[in-house]
Amino acid sequence: MDSLRDPEHALVVLSGGQDSTTCLYWALSRFAQVSAISFDYGQRHRVELDAARTIAAMAGVGHTIIPINTFSALGGNALTDQQMSPDTGPDAETLLPNTFVPGRNLVFLTFAAAWAWPRGIRHIVTGVAQTDYSGYPDCRENTLRALELAINLGMESRMRLHMPLMFLSKADTVTLARTVGAMPALAFSHTCYAGAVPPCGQCAACVLRAKGFAEAGIPDPLLNRLAGV
């Protein structure tokens, strides 16, 4: 297996959630060296960063957390504004859910590229997906390929953005997680918009996660761990 791995170094944007955890293990199966980067952007629940720390340690990869307080200062979305409740329906004008953080993926990936550049890392892995996305325009392949071009022009580099989940359903993502050995780490991942442990099971993120595991016919290792199974 090692002989089939790319000899280069990959950087994974790790949120502590299901998708980025799956991508971390996908990268471990394909690259000789893997590091993870997370962002403290004033997100609603610190449990996400705690999950990222735990998962990076389980995977045995170097993990860097970059502080960015800009998003909480901007406000206007339920993931950084404590006064807003997630899942109140799409905005009447933009038709986007209030959990959309404008520019988040663009900023994260640009910062990831800036961190990777002086370290000679050319591969950046992100867990965004177009098929199951919640209407987020920064999860679309054309958006991220345009960003890849901008990064390479702006940094005089040849970086590549890897999006292994882009066209996978949530069920396909669960199956991939099992294939790459991510299931033990998924037992410590966090998805719930409410920040609840155990997860609330009712928010859009919880419903989508449950649907994926159910359609894949695989028990959710997080629920099994919390139930003591």
UniProtKB/Swiss-Prot annotation:
UniProt: ATP binding residues: 14-24
Family: Belongs to the QueC family.
Free-text cofactor note: Binds 1 zinc ion per subunit.
Function: Catalyzes the ATP-dependent conversion of 7-carboxy-7-deazaguanine (CDG) to 7-cyano-7-deazaguanine (preQ(0)).
Database matches in InterPro entries: QueC, Rossmann-like_a/b/a_fold
Protein name: 7-cyano-7-deazaguanine synthase
Catalyzed reactions: 7-carboxy-7-deazaguanine + NH4(+) + ATP = 7-cyano-7-deazaguanine + ADP + phosphate + H2O + H(+)
Pathway(s) per entry: Purine metabolism; 7-cyano-7-deazaguanine biosynthesis
Binding of Zn(2+), residues: 192, 200, 203, 206
Cofactor: Zn(2+)
Organism of provenance: Laribacter hongkongensis (strain HLHK9)
Gene name tied to this protein: queC
EC code: 6.3.4.20
Gene Ontology biological process terms from the UniProt entry: queuosine biosynthetic process
GO molecular function: ATP binding; ligase activity, forming carbon-nitrogen bonds; zinc ion binding
Leader sequence residues: none
UniProt keyword annotations, A-Z: ATP-binding, Ligase, Metal-binding, Nucleotide-binding, Queuosine biosynthesis, Zinc
Keyword Kinase listed: no
